Amino acid sequence: MGVFNFEDETTSIVAPARLYKALVTDSDNLIPKVIDAIQSIEIVEGNGGAGTIKKLTFVEGGETKYDLHKVDLVDDVNFAYNYSIVGGGGLPDTVEKISFESKLSAGPDGGSIAKLTVKYFTKGDAAPSEEEIKGGKARGDGLFKALEGYVLANPDY
C-alpha cells in the first residue's frame, strides 16, 4: 500500500469557533441545506465521536451515490476534526481510503487559518491521479466556501 500526502491551507474572515460550528458541529444538518448535490448525512453507527460511521448521500452525474465516513478525531477545544472516507462511490478504484486531518486556528483580524492534510492510502503503489487530486481539492474548497458564506450571511449563527 502506498501513502500519498497533500497539504493545503486557506484563510477565512470568520472566527475559528463559528467556522468550526458550521464545518463540524452542525455539519450533518447544515451541509445538505447549503450544498445542493448532498442529499443527506446520517449516522450509521456511533454517537458522533471518534469511531462513528456516517453515510453521506449525494448526486453525481445524475446518479445517487454515497460515501462512508469514519470519524477519527473530534477536538472541540482545539478546533480539530479528522475523518476518513472508507467506502462508497467517492473512492477511486485504486484507493483503499482517504484520510482528512483538519485544524482551525486564529488568523488575522479575528478570522481563521484552516489547515488540511489529505492522505491517500492506495492499493499497491498506484499514486492518485492529478485529476483525482484536483477534483477532491475543488470539492473541498467548494464545501468550505459554501459553509463560510452561510456563516457570513447569518450573523446570528
Curated annotation (Swiss-Prot):
Induction: Not induced during nodulation. Up-regulated upon pathogen infection. GO terms for biological process: abscisic acid-activated signaling pathway; defense response. Keywords: Pathogenesis-related protein, Plant defense. It holds the Pfam family Bet_v_1. One of its GO terms (cellular component) is nucleus. Coiled coil: none annotated. InterPro entries: Bet_v_I/MLP, Bet_v_I_allergen, Plant_def-hormone_signal, START-like_dom_sf. GO terms for molecular function: abscisic acid binding; protein phosphatase inhibitor activity; signaling receptor activity. PROSITE patterns: PATHOGENESIS_BETVI. Expressed in roots. Detected in nodules and leaves, but not in stems and flowers. Belongs to the BetVI family. This is Class-10 pathogenesis-related protein 1. It comes from Medicago truncatula.
